[in-house]
Each structure stands twice: as structure tokens, then as C-alpha cells.
A protein has these predicted regions:
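Cytosolic-facing regulatory segments adjacent to core modules
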Residues: 60-61, 91-178, 192, 288-290
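Flexible beta-alpha connector loops of hexameric P-loop NTPases
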Residues: 127-130, 154-159, 191-204, 234-241
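C-terminal regions of RecA-like/P-loop NTPase motor modules
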Residues: 162-182, 215-217, 231-343
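Helical hairpin unit composed of two closely spaced alpha helices linked by a short loop
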Residues: 180-212
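Short, small/acidic-rich helices and loops at N termini and domain boundaries
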Residues: 1-34
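Structural recognition of the conserved hydrophobic beta-strand(s) that form the central parallel beta-sheet
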Residues: 183, 220-227
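The Walker A/P-loop phosphate-binding site
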Residues: 23-122, 142, 150, 342
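A short beta-strand-to-loop transition that corresponds to the Sensor-1 phosphate-sensing loop
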Residues: 105-106, 224-229, 264
Length: 343
């Protein structure tokens, strides 16, 4: 009973706080009149936020993604999307940002196990042996000193919408956990707030709902994953393009950045994961990030500059050739040669 009273009370407080904030965002901004404030804000509260992976930041215009961005990871079903998202989330914790991981597919215990494995670099068997409990506790104490938390929530697919996630973020913030990064695994399985029946409309609206949620809750970023079409599987060894996105092309309109997880047979053998840029609003039209993968330990480590240089020498030329052959956007000479600016 007390808990229900607390819920009602915390909602009232939240409402009062929301209403008392000056409605700054509703007002237009002035190019000339606002110069001083704008320059100060750029330094004090940068609106571009780097992600944990250097190579992805390097292919953007400003070394990161604008706040409230919605980014999408593409791959075929049952591939490495969740694996990649777990490692991304781990990176954000190291950047002192609390993460909410909303899962529609795997189950929260499995996701949490993957996080712990990835963090302490152990296999599932080693984790369950109990021999590494001390190591886990030591690692988590270090994260606790950063004042961050990772929250994993399993939600029913096709029923849960962004209003539920919003309530959850508010509830966590009331408990002192300031969620700044949202991972949704995956958004295509959520219901839209408008309760659309048709998949195409539902998915389009879910992405709009997520964008609105990111802005309203002042999230740094939202990452989600999405499946590719059957046709898209042909591009797994090269690079996906925007027509490979299953379910709704509107995702391209509403996402800030879309990357695909690719690898050739040789790269698979060498445990290399290649993250290829499909489309982004503010940065280079093409580019990639490379990672060394250990799926057994759920760990994905970014290439060093030296490893990247070696990779480009060994694989680079061959890869560029096959990219041009596959009717990829890079076969369009003009687009390929355009190496900067908005696209």
C-alpha cells in the first residue's frame, strides 16, 4: 500500500518538477542575438557526444553524435547484434554514463550474464564455476566508484511501447539512477504509441516515438538493432545498403546513423568484425570500424591504430574492389570521392 502511495507521490513530484522548468526549448534561437550564449554552451554543454568507439567517432563530422540521436545496428537474425550492443553499453559505463538495456528477445538473466562475461573477460562456463566471483565483485566496485549503473529490463514484444520505457526511466531517475543511454534490443519489436496494426506504420511510428522519447528524457543517445532482408544477406561480406533494411524504409528517415555488422569468410576465421557505415546524417558517406571478437567471452575490442594500418594493408584493397563490384553506393564515383560534409 505504501508503495502505491509512493508511486503516486513520486509522479506528482515529477510533474511539478517538469512544469517548473523554464520552457526554453519551445522558444526560437537567434543567430545574432544568441551568439554569446551559444558559444558558451558549446564549451560548457557540448551537444555532440562521442561514442565509446574511436573509429566510429572518426567518421563523423564533429567526433561524435548529436545528443538525442537514434542509431541503428543492422545484421541478419541470430548474428552479432546483441553481442555488439553489450560491448557498446559496457563502453558507455566506462564513460560514466548509466545505461538502460531494454530487451525483447533474450531474457534479462542472459543479457546480464553477457555483460559480466564481457566485463571480466570470461566464458559462461568460467562465470558459472564460481571461481571468478571475487573478480566480478572487484570489477563492479570500480564501476560503482564511477557512480553508474546498468539496468536490464525484459519487456514483452509487440505490447510494450515508448510510454512504458519513459515511465521506467523516470522511476529509475527517482531512485537516483540517471539513465543517459538507452539500448533497445530491438525497436522493431515494440508497439507504437498509436497502436498501429500494420508493421510498416508501426515500425515507422516506433522510430518517431523513440526520437521523441530521447528528446523529452534528454538522453545522450539511443542504440537499437534491426534485421536485414533476405536480399540483404548477399551483402553480408561487403556492406549493407539502405534497401537491405527489413520492414520499413522509414527507419532511414528517422535514424541519425545506421551501421551494419559485416565480415568475409576470412575475417570470420580471423575473429574480425567489421562495422560498416550504411548511412549517417552528419559525417563521411562511408567508413568502417574494426574489432577483434571473442564471442565465447562476449568481448569485442576495437583495433588499435597500428592493427588498423595492418588490416588496411592486408585486406583493404581487396575489400574496396569487392565493394565497387557489388553495385554499392561507392561504385558511384562522385559519392565515393565526396569525403566530407553533410549527406
Amino acid at each position: 500500500d505504501n508503495f502505491e502511495q509512493y508511486e503516486t507521490y513520486s509522479r506528482k513530484i515529477e510533474k511539478i518538477l517538469q512544469n517548473s522548468k523554464p520552457k526554453k526549448d519551445d522558444e526560437p534561437i537567434f543567430m545574432i542575438r544568441d551568439i554569446t550564449e551559444r558559444q558558451f554552451k558549446r564549451q560548457a554543454e557540448p551537444s555532440v557526444i562521442p561514442c565509446p568507439f574511436r573509429q566510429l567517432n572518426d567518421i563523423t563530422n564533429a567526433g561524435g553524435y548529436p545528443e538525442h540521436s537514434v542509431n541503428v545496428i543492422l545484421d541478419k537474425p541470430k548474428a552479432k547484434k546483441t553481442f555488439f550492443m553489450v560491448n557498446l553499453a559496457r563502453g558507455y559505463l566506462r564513460m560514466k554514463k548509466s545505461v538502460l538495456y531494454v530487451d525483447t528477445e533474450n531474457g534479462k538473466e542472459q543479457i546480464m550474464d553477457r555483460f559480466i562475461q564481457s566485463s571480466i573477460n570470461k566464458t559462461k562456463k568460467e562465470l558459472y564455476s564460481g571461481e571468478y566471483d571475487k573478480l566480478e565483485a572487484k570489477h563492479l566496485r570500480k564501476l560503482a566508484r564511477f557512480g553508474v549503473e546498468l539496468v536490464v529490463e525484459r519487456v514483452p514484444a509487440m505490447i510494450t511501447d515508448c510510454n512504458y520505457i519513459r515511465e521506467l526511466i523516470i522511476k529509475l531517475r527517482n531512485q537516483g539512477i540517471n539513465i543517459k543511454v538507452l539500448m533497445v534490443d530491438y525497436a522493431g519489436k515494440l508497439a507504437s504509441i498509436a497502436r498501429d496494426k500494420e508493421d510498416f506504420d508501426r515500425i515507422s511510428n516506433v522510430y518517431i516515438d523513440i526520437q521523441n522519447l530521447a528528446e523529452e528524457m534528454d538522453l545522450d543517445i539511443v542504440w537499437t538493432a534491426h534485421h536485414i532482408t533476405r536480399e540483404g544477406k548477399k551483402h553480408r561480406t561487403t556492406r549493407y545498403d539502405e534497401n537491405d533494411i527489413s520492414g520499413s524504409i522509414a527507419i532511414v528517415r528517422n535514424a541519425h546513423t545506421i551501421v551494419g555488422l559485416n565480415s568475409t569468410e576470412q575475417e570470420e576465421k580471423d575473429d574480425i568484425l567489421r562495422c560498416e557505415l550504411v548511412v549517417q546524417r552528419d559525417g563521411l558517406p562511408s567508413g568502417r570500424a574494426l574489432f577483434k571478437c571473442d564471442v565465447e567471452r562476449q568481448r569485442c575490442v576495437e583495433f588499435t591504430k597500428e592493427q588498423r594500418k595492418q588490416y588496411d594493408e592486408i585486406y583493404g584493397e581487396k575489400l574496396e574492389e569487392s565493394l565497387k563490384k557489388k553495385g554499392n553506393p561507392d561504385a558511384n564515383e562522385d559519392k565515393y570521392n565526396k569525403k566530407q560534409g553533410d549527406i
